Swiss-Prot record:
Top-rank lineage group of the source organism: Eukaryota
Binding site for Cu cation: 47, 49, 64, 121
SUPFAM superfamilies linked to this entry: Cu,Zn superoxide dismutase-like
Name of the featured protein: Superoxide dismutase [Cu-Zn]
CDD domains: Cu-Zn_Superoxide_Dismutase
Function, in words: Destroys radicals which are normally produced within the cells and which are toxic to biological systems.
Organism expressing this protein natively: Kluyveromyces lactis (strain ATCC 8585 / CBS 2359 / DSM 70799 / NBRC 1267 / NRRL Y-1140 / WM37) (Yeast)
Compartment(s) of residence: Cytoplasm
Binding residue positions for substrate: 144
Residues where Zn(2+) binds: 64, 72, 81, 84
Length: 155
């Protein structure tokens, strides 16, 4: 069992914690989060970005983690970046709390996301269905409101 965590901060009021858990390299990874400071009753893009570099804020995290050179897509799509996690919903207070499992996100092995950055975006991810080049690259999810480098944790 491997556990990892990212503490999200940014230039906005958005902040939170994202936790990752994987039993073994061939198992799905559970991702859970509690994130505050978003707009109320919204959907916000949620992605793993390539670099664990936040020296220039969330911008230096680079593009979505995409080791297979695919187009952007929804988490359930075969054509997607490894780092495409779709949208997280917020409640009436702008809080998002939830979990999902994903077969492409790995904490173990050569495609590990440990040391990369998780990002919450300012807008809704169109899941690559927006009909333009940017949709196929970023999902038109907008600015990077908060981010954190993913590191190994003890629980």
């Amino acid at each position: 069992m491997v556990n990892a965590v990212a503490v999200l901060k940014g230039d906005s009021s958005v902040s939170g914690i994202v936790r990752f858990e994987q039993e073994s390299e061939d198992q799905q990874t559970k991702i859970s989060w509690e994130i505050t400071g978003n707009d109320a009753n919204a959907l916000r893009g949620f992605h793993i970005h390539t670099f664990g570099d936040n020296t220039n804020g969330c911008t230096s995290a680079g593009p979505h983690f995409n080791p297979f050179n695919k187009n952007h897509g929804a988490p359930e799509d075969e054509e997607r970046h490894v780092g495409d996690l779709g949208n997280i919903p917020t409640d009436a207070q702008g809080i998002s709390k939830g979990s999902l499992t994903d077969k492409h996100i790995k904490l173990l092995g050569p495609l590990s996301i440990v040391g990369r950055t998780v990002v919450v975006h300012a807008g809704q991810d169109d899941l690559g269905k927006g009909g333009d080049a940017e949709s196929l690259k970023t999902g038109n999810a907008g600015a990077r409101h908060a981010c954190g480098v993913i590191g190994i944790s003890n629980a």
